[in-house]
Every structure is written in structure tokens, then in C-alpha cells.
A protein has these predicted regions:
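Interfacial loop-to-helix junctions that mark the boundaries of transmembrane helices
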Residues: 1-6, 25-28, 51-62, 173-185, ...
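Structural signature of hydrophobic alpha-helical transmembrane segments
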Residues: 2-12, 57-71, 113, 117-121, ...
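Hydrophobic mid-bilayer segments of alpha-helices in multi-pass membrane transport proteins
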Residues: 6-17, 26-47, 59-71, 123, ...
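Membrane-embedded alpha-helical segments and adjacent helix-loop junctions characteristic
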Residues: 49, 53-140, 279, 284-346
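Membrane-interface alpha-helices at helix entry/exit sites of multi-pass transporters
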Residues: 95-103, 133-146, 173-184, 346-356, ...
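Alpha-helical transmembrane segments and, especially, the helix-loop junctions at the ends
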Residues: 112-122, 139-172, 193-198, 326-339, ...
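Juxtamembrane and boundary regions of transmembrane helices in multi-pass small-molecule transporters
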Residues: 137, 176-219, 359, 363-366, ...
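Long, contiguous bundles of hydrophobic transmembrane helices that form the permeation core
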Residues: 188-267
């Protein structure tokens, strides 16, 4: 099989796999589509078995880390952390939609950074719906904030997003160094979102005519907070003590899951589902498909397009092209394709890629799996959104957030 034919076939398989992930037909799980696509490419010779195995081994630690963080997030839900966050938002806002939006911004940013964007989408969004209903105010600004902050605030830590984990392992940065470099870009992106949201949703943020009763002071679940503190401290010290962060994540998952099993407040089957094995298998299959595309010439094409320098102009170009690519093929395959190229060019290009693939997906529905998941959460709440409104909001936030975050990344790299 010629390289051109192999690349064309691989891109076709990638397109079909992503279409299944977006549409999620009940008769064809996304994991099955990705695995079938990867096996097919091995069978037709588009990628050798050894290269496919290498791709799976390279993704192994990332997959293990993600599974552990999903279990920690599920444990925090079970311990009542998200319900406490909802009560805190309702009490602190005092009936003001503007203050409620501020609380949602802060809490969504923190949850995204610490527990991952999936926790914000799946666990916080329903709480926001309930909180807004209790306050008798429109939930639209706050629900949109969950979607946008899940993407924009996921720049901060390696654990915040699967895309970050992929870049983290490729960049060879320590956990603390990664967070230090991405702190200012994250603040910049969130600040842009806040400014735009206040103006875009001005009519929805008017004070309601009737304020609901003020909720009682919430009590944070101390055990869940302690597990999170232990896990994050372990991440911060991982490079100092010479232990991979995945082991601290595994310890945190065990610490919050084993007592629940002992108390019979959960079961092994429930825990297995919480780890989302279907999604993890999908990522592994997708990794093989993207690797097949890379070895058949896609990496050469990417290298020809992306700058390799770390000047402000280069970083802006990398972030912009990464955002465009994420909205064309979704940010997960975009990261798998782009990070090996940009990480080889240095820390700056690799992190600029993350700005593009994390912030950029707020522009369209298909830009990230988190946004697609957010739409499914809205359907369970009998809520829908207007495509035009979503696109207008993205057009206002994404370019400005990309610019601000990339400029501050460039400044952070100079320190």
C-alpha cells in the first residue's frame, strides 16, 4: 500500500470514528468503532503491529491516570462535595444572578483544574440547574459558563484535561513547572470569558423579582477534601520524590473508593462504570488510528505548516492553527497529531498547542468531547440551546482568549 493511499484510508477511518463519537448511535459504541478502525488499519498494512503496540504503550500511563482521576471525581460526588458546592453558590449569591455567575465561574474553574473538565460538565452542570431553579433565575448564563470554563480553565494543571496529560508526558515538565507556566494563561482566558459573559448575558443577569429562601450554611465533606488535598500535594511533590504522578492519583482513587466499598455505598460494578472504560478504550483505539496517519505522512504535513520557534508570533500562529484543527477534527485527535511535533520544538510550542486545543473548542459544538457531553447533559435536563447563540458567544470569547492566553504564556516563558 502506497503512503498516499494509506494516509487517505487512515483519514477516512478517523473521520468515521469521530462521526460515531459525535453521533453516538446506540448500536455502535465509540469504543467499538475506534478499536475496529485500529485493527482494520493493522490488517491492511497501514500501520505495523509493533508501531500500534508502541502507541498503546505510550498512552498507557495517561489512561491509568485518567481512570484514577475519574474515580476520585466519582468519590467526591458520592461524598456530597458537588451538592455542597451548589449550596455554597446559592447561599453566597444572595439571590443575585450576577453573584451566582461569579460563584459558578470560580467553582467551575477550580473543579476543572483540580478534578478535570469532565467533572465540571457531568457533575457540576446539573447542580447549577438546580441552584438556578431554587433562586428563580435563568440558568442559561451559568450553564454556558460550565461549558466554556470546562475548556478554558482546563489549561492550568496536567490533570485538568486529557489533552494536558498527553502534552505533559511529551513535554517532560514537572507538575509544578507545568502549572506555573500555565497559571497566567489560565487567568487570562477565564478573565476574557468573564468580561464577555457579563455583557453577552446582561438581560439574563437581571435581578429576579422574587428571591428564594437563603439556604443553610453548607458543610464541606472533610474526607473528600482531605483526599483531594493529599492527591494534589502528591502531584506537586512527585518530581521531588521521584514518584510518577499516576501513583498518587491511584492512591487517591483507592483512598476514596475502598471505604465506600466497605460501607457498601458503592459496588465494584459502579466503580468500574465511573472509570468510563468505554471512553478509555476509545482513546486507545484513536491513538492507534492517529499514529497510523502520522507514520503515513500526516506528521510531515503538520511539520510543514506549524512554526517551530518560540517567538510571540510563532506561539500565536501555533495556538491559532491548533484551535482551527481542533474544531475541524475535535481536540483529542488534534492533540495526538500536533503534540508530538510541537513538543519536539520545545516547551513554548507544546503549551501554545494546548491553548489552541483547549480554548479553541468553545467556538463550535464539535471542538471537544466535553462540549458534546455538555449537550447530552442539557438534553437530560430537557433544555436545548440555539446554535446561533452558541456560535456568537464562541466568536466573541475564543479569539480574545487565545490572544490573551498566548501573550501571557510568552511572558511566562521569559521569566
Amino acid at each position: 500500500m502506497t503512503d498516499g493511499l494509506a494516509l487517505a484510508g487512515t483519514l477516512l477511518v478517523l473521520g468515521v470514528t469521530l462521526a460515531v463519537a459525535v453521533a453516538r448511535p446506540p448500536y455502535l459504541p465509540e469504543a467499538v468503532a475506534a478499536c475496529a478502525g485500529g485493527v482494520l488499519l493493522v490488517l491492511v498494512g497501514a500501520i505495523g503491529l509493533s508501531r500500534a503496540s508502541d502507541a498503546l504503550r505510550a498512552l498507557g500511563p495517561t489512561i491509568g491516570f485518567l481512570a484514577a482521576m475519574l474515580l476520585i471525581a466519582d468519590g467526591c460526588r458520592r461524598e456530597g462535595l458537588f451538592d455542597a458546592m451548589g449550596a455554597l453558590m446559592a447561599r453566597g449569591s444572595g439571590g443575585s444572578p450576577q453573584r451566582l455567575l461569579a460563584f459558578v465561574f470560580v467553582i467551575a474553574a477550580v473543579i476543572t483544574a483540580v478534578l478535570s473538565l469532565d467533572a465540571t460538565i457531568v457533575l457540576l452542570t446539573p447542580v447549577v440547574f438546580v441552584t438556578a431553579a431554587r433562586m428563580r433565575t435563568s440558568a442559561k448564563p451559568q450553564v454556558y459558563a460550565c461549558a466554556h470554563l470546562a475548556n478554558s480553565a482546563s489549561l492550568l494543571l496536567p490533570v485538568s484535561n486529557l489533552t494536558n496529560l498527553l502534552a505533559f508526558h511529551a513535554s517532560k515538565l514537572s507538575f509544578l513547572h507545568f502549572g506555573a507556566l500555565m497559571a497566567l494563561p489560565t487567568i487570562a482566558a477565564v478573565a476574557v470569558e468573564w468580561i464577555v459573559f457579563r455583557r453577552f448575558f446582561a438581560a439574563d443577569l437581571e435581578r429576579p423579582r422574587r428571591a428564594g429562601a437563603r439556604p443553610a450554611r453548607p458543610e464541606l465533606p472533610r474526607f473528600a477534601v482531605a483526599v483531594l488535598a493529599f492527591t494534589l500535594t502528591g502531584f506537586a511533590l512527585s518530581s521531588v520524590v521521584g514518584i510518577e504522578p499516576v501513583w498518587f492519583a491511584a492512591a487517591g482513587a483507592a483512598a476514596i473508593s475502598i471505604p465506600a466499598l466497605a460501607r457498601r455505598t458503592t459496588t465494584p460494578v459502579v466503580l468500574a462504570r465511573a472509570a468510563e472504560p468505554g471512553f478509555l478504550i476509545f482513546v486507545l483505539g484513536l491513538g492507534v488510528i492517529v499514529q497510523a496517519a502520522s507514520v503515513n505522512g500526516l506528521d510531515t504535513a503538520v511539520r510543514a505548516v506549524l512554526p517551530t520557534g518560540a517567538s510571540l508570533g510563532d506561539l500565536l500562529m501555533i495556538a491559532a492553527l491548533s484551535a482551527i484543527f481542533a474544531n475541524l477534527v475535535n481536540n483529542l485527535p488534534a492533540t495526538l497529531m500536533l503534540v508530538p511535533v510541537t513538543a519536539a520544538a520545545g516547551t513554548g510550542p507544546a503549551l501554545a498547542t494546548l491553548i489552541g486545543v483547549n480554548v479553541g473548542p468553545n467556538l463550535t459544538y464539535v471542538g471537544s468531547l466535553a462540549t458534546l457531553l455538555w449537550r447530552r447533559v442539557l438534553r437530560t435536563e430537557d433544555t436545548d440551546i440555539e446554535l446561533g447563540e452558541f456560535l456568537r458567544l464562541g466568536a466573541l470569547t475564543v479569539p480574545a482568549a487565545l490572544l490573551a492566553a498566548t501573550v501571557l504564556l510568552w511572558l511566562a516563558l521569559k521569566v
